[in-house]
């Protein structure tokens, strides 16, 4: 697909639904797996996904972050990520946060035992909170800036649009025979 949308209804398809999905099938008419965590009422409309080790393994295409984003997920917190998936998250406006396994275990315990448990992420301060601070997380300053400013690769390029146009104009003056026709 060349569109970045429409993947959310198929996120975790084999776990969310009890039947076999097909391209073009109306997912609203499919049999829901009521036991799957993201189908539970208490997790509806959540924007932070907590996960375990090596999250995103096998998801080397950008379709995986597109599906998460389309589903409403803006942050994924896990003890580790597949490398390509991790990079693709940043390219698509999702914040992947890596925390130690012991901290993740504590978060999972709280989520399972406390109905209404919520966590928030403060990207600027690089902190995760519930009733108190859970953890500080590290993030590359450039990637942080891009997420804070809502910039993807194209947006970054367009920030320099005037400089690029000026360069192209001067370049064509110096090398007029290279100008396309």
Q: Locations of the language-model features?
A:
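Cytosolic catalytic domains that perform sulfur/thiol-centered chemistry
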Residues: 1-52, 56-181
């Amino acid at each position: 697909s060349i569109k970045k949308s429409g993947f959310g209804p198929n996120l975790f398809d084999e776990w969310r639904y009890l039947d076999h999905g097909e391209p073009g099938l109306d997912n609203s008419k499919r049999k829901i797996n009521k036991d799957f965590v993201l189908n539970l009422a208490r997790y509806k409309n959540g924007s932070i996904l907590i996960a375990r080790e090596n999250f995103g393994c096998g998801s080397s295409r950008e379709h995986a972050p597109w599906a998460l984003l389309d589903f409403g997920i803006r942050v994924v917190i896990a003890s580790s990520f597949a490398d390509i998936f991790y990079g693709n998250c940043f390219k698509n406006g999702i914040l992947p946060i890596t925390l130690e396994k012991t901290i993740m275990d504590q978060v999972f315990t709280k989520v399972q035992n406390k109905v209404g448990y919520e966590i928030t992420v403060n990207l600027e301060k690089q902190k995760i909170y519930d009733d108190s601070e859970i953890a500080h997380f590290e993030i590359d300053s450039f990637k942080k800036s891009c997420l804070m400013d809502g910039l993807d690769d194209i947006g970054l390029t367009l920030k320099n649009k005037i400089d690029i146009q000026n360069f192209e104009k001067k370049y064509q003056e110096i090398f007029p025979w290279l100008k396309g026709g």
